[in-house]
Curated annotation (Swiss-Prot):
This is ATP synthase subunit beta, chloroplastic. It is found in: Plastid, Chloroplast thylakoid membrane. NCBIfam families: atpD (TIGR01039). Its EC number is 7.1.2.2. It comes from Magnolia tripetala (Umbrella-tree). It is a peripheral membrane protein.
Length: 498
């Protein structure tokens, strides 16, 4: 889908200064603004309040029109704090929705919801901007081919493959490797697909956003020496921001991603952390606007809001946006309207397991809980499907036998079960892999493993050809040839010790 970005920088055009309104009422982040008859702004238009507060400090607040109230009044939601605003202040109708900078100049930079850089690195070197409100691509523009998005991460590509232009839910608590997995995906899409990434921090902790930025600089995903070489643009709307900003920051990130897809014709990864906070912010805004709440107190427009965001994330004939969304499940209740509405849009789920992380198996992706609609013989092929199913069956059998092993020991198992356990332990270790972005911490060089190599490796383990190799040979290696080489090295080392 082609877009026609404007070539003017963000700001208030002199033409629209003729359309001035005045603040009639302020209730927290909500403003009622009166305009002259016949000069009413449209829904989603950006309004700008400029002036000075009582102590002479400059004020510059951007709002978005949400309702037309009648009597020449509109109700708008502020995108920043409304401290210092007073009734009677002048409000400028910009005559257009919020527009944010787009293009290569956004890479390596941090933006707020308005597209303003907040990283103290000066202004963004682009005059190309794009409005955050746009319709989804028309059906005729969509790329309807079902194709796998290869990540180079064995456990993902084999057991829960991502769809090109699909949406993936990332489930995981604190400290199980979510950030490192996100950074590896950003790194791999840049190297293998020539693509870029956009990270939308929606209602996350400021500390987490800062940690992510620092880790990206450390791992080379953001190149401090040459910003243009960076692989990701960051857009943050933190927990302390007003609900209007948290509700729109996802759209700002998506708009930047759409430009890379439609104009640069690239494959783009869009990360949203956390999609639940997007719903939560919408719920707050809905209550502030006086709408009647729906199920569990959520906004009545929940499905519409979620759909308008998710439908824009798709593959077109030009390129693709593949979205990975962290999903917080309130009180672990999957039937809560927020996660339930999100699930309807997901093509795959990647579940991170604390148990695997405790064993030191990274990425700690749970092979049994992670799912994908792409894992079908007609899409991935019989060979891939059969291998994935056998890996899952072996892992499931090992899980069932663990209680017996804990109570009676391994010797009490049948010969067949002992063989299953040995292969399952090799599979578990072979699902781990060294990451490029973790090289600085582990000292092991990262590995990108192609899908064909991944399938071949697991087939060799399942066939019994590698039963004689020690299980530690399969830990943190790339393809199966590295595992056999590691086994030979271990054998040589043990002989030398003797």
């Amino acid at each position: 889908m082609r877009i026609n970005p404007t070539t003017s920088g963000p700001g208030v055009s002199t033409l629209e200064k003729k359309n001035l309104g005045r603040i009639a009422q302020i209730i927290g982040p909500v403003l009622d603004v009166a305009f002259p008859p016949g000069k009413m702004p449209n829904i989603y238009n950006a309004l700008v309040v400029k002036g000075r507060d009582t102590v002479g400090q400059p004020i510059n607040v951007t709002c978005e029109v949400q309702q037309l109230l009648g009597n020449n009044r509109v109700r708008a939601v502020a995108m920043s704090a409304t401290d210092g605003l007073m009734r009677g202040m002048e409000v400028i109708d910009t005559g257009a929705p919020l527009s944010v900078p787009v293009g290569g100049a956004t890479l390596g930079r941090i933006f707020n919801v308005l597209g303003e850089p907040v990283d103290n690195l000066g202004p963004v070197d682009t005059r190309t901007t794009s409005p955050i409100h746009r319709s989804a691509p028309a059906f005729i523009q969509l790329d309807t081919k079902l194709s796998i998005f290869e990540t180079g991460i064995k456990v993902v590509d084999l057991l829960a493959p991502y769809r090109r232009g699909g949406k993936i839910g990332l489930f995981g608590g604190a400290g199980v490797g979510k950030t490192v997995l996100i950074m590896e995906l950003i790194n791999n899409i840049a190297k293998a697909h020539g693509g870029v990434s956009v990270f939308g921090g929606v209602g996350e902790r400021t500390r987490e956003g800062n940690d992510l930025y620092m880790e990206m600089k450390e791992s080379g995903v953001i190149n401090e020496q040459n910003i243009a070489e960076s692989k990701v643009a960051l857009v943050y709307g933190q927990m302390n921001e007003p609900p209007g900003a948290r509700m729109r920051v996802g759209l700002t990130a998506l708009t930047m991603a759409e430009y890379f897809r439609d104009v640069n014709e690239q494959d783009v990864l869009l990360f949203i952390d956390n999609i639940f906070r997007f719903v939560q912010a919408g719920s707050e805004v809905s209550a502030l606007l006086g709408r009647m709440p729906s199920a569990v107190g959520y906004q009545p427009t929940l499905s519409t809001e979620m759909g308008s965001l998710q439908e824009r994330i798709t593959s077109t004939k030009e390129g693709s946006i593949t979205s990975i969304q962290a999903v917080y499940v309130p009180a672990d209740d999957l039937t809560d309207p927020a996660p339930a509405t999100t699930f309807a849009h997901l093509d795959a789920t990647t579940v991170l397991s604390r148990g695997l992380a405790a064993k030191g198996i990274y990425p700690a992706v749970d092979p049994l809980d992670s799912t994908s609609t792409m894992l079908q013989p007609r899409i991935v092929g019989e060979e891939h499907y059969e291998t994935a199913q056998r890996v899952k069956q072996t892992s499931q059998r090992y899980k069932e036998l663990q209680d017996i092993i804990a109570i009676l020991g391994l010797d009490e198992l049948s010969e067949e079960d002992r063989l299953t356990v040995a292969r399952a332990r090799k599979i578990e270790r072979f699902l781990s892999q060294p990451f490029f972005v973790a090289e600085v911490f582990t000292g092991s060089p990262g590995k990108y493993v192609g899908l064909a190599e991944t399938i071949r490796g697991f087939q060799l383990i399942l066939s019994g050809e590698l039963d004689g190799l020690p299980e530690q040979a399969f830990y943190l290696v790339g393809n199966i040839d590295e595992a056999t080489a590691k086994a030979m090295n271990l054998e040589v080392e043990s002989k030398l010790k003797k």
